[in-house]
Amino acid sequence: MQLLKASDIISHLQIDGIFPGGNAIPCTHLNNYMNIKEKQLMNTIADVQSSRDLRNLPINQVGIKDLRFPITLQTAEGIQSTIARLTMTVYLPAEQKGTHMSRFVALMEQHAEALDFAQLRKLTTEMVALLDSRAGKISVSFPFFRKKTAPVSGIRSLLDYDVCLTGEIKDGAYGHSMKVMIPVTSLCPCSKEISQYGAHNQRSHVTVSLTADAEVGIEEVIDYVEAQASCQLYGLLKRPDEKYVTEKAYENPKFVEDMVRDVATSLIADKRIKSFVVESENFESIHNHSAYAYIAYP
């Protein structure tokens, strides 16, 4: 590969009429020159994606998956920074060979606003327009952290939750959904009933997926679930706290069936929520398998 000398660059600039002469090249002139040359180069490169496809098969979703990207979240408890994994896809008509993959990343690079449902709608709308499509979907998955206070000592610590926000444009309409996984403690009612002392308990993952007519906060979904668990989880506990959570779980036993039914009852009472799925997986401490339950509403 032959390297271009500074004198050669000056010569090209002089020939193109961008920089008339001299020994120093101002950055603005050089940037203008490079932008012009880049556009000229792009015009000479074949755009294969935009060529015609003859197989007559549309693609429901095509795009990028698992793009890791730093985001900020606008939540009820303030702005939070986190790292997201994004899947961004659009509908591709039968006659078009391919989509423009670089445009998905370019769109994310342009957005610095904190993410909430309003911003997700804006992002999805812009993506569909940018890709010249009639339908598109963006899923944003990220760890969400919440500061929790230990029940006795009052010590504060963070606990993480897995969240996925999805925005979709389909058939000319926009819709969004939210999925939150909340870790909790469950204690077996049967074990408590038949044992002279103690009962087996374990960590459980309760996952809520919902759609709503009005915005429902991530924190609200977490509160609904934690209120129905045998006990909440905490990032940091002292001995008095550990005693408290152990005894609270013992006094509030829940089967996996109880968990999904009680959470579902709370969600049904919230008139903003129009549909949901509740799942609970109990990582049984006395078995090498999990207990599982699922409710879909309506």
Curated annotation (Swiss-Prot):
GO MF annotations in UniProt: GTP cyclohydrolase activity; GTP cyclohydrolase I activity
Catalysed conversion reaction: GTP + H2O = 7,8-dihydroneopterin 3'-triphosphate + formate + H(+)
Tree of life domain: Bacteria
GO biological process terms on file: tetrahydrofolate biosynthetic process
Entry keywords, A to Z: Hydrolase
Gene3D superfamilies: Urate Oxidase
EC number: 3.5.4.16
InterPro entries to which the protein is assigned, alphabetical: GTP_cyclohydrolase_FolE2, GTP_cyclohydrolase_FolE2/MptA
Site, as annotated: May be catalytically important: C188
Pathway in which the depicted protein is active: Cofactor biosynthesis; 7,8-dihydroneopterin triphosphate biosynthesis; 7,8-dihydroneopterin triphosphate from GTP: step 1/1
Pfam family, any one: GCHY-1
Top EC class of this enzyme: hydrolase
Task of the protein: Converts GTP to 7,8-dihydroneopterin triphosphate.
HAMAP family xref list: GTP_cyclohydrol_B
Family: Belongs to the GTP cyclohydrolase IV family.
Designated name of the protein: GTP cyclohydrolase FolE2
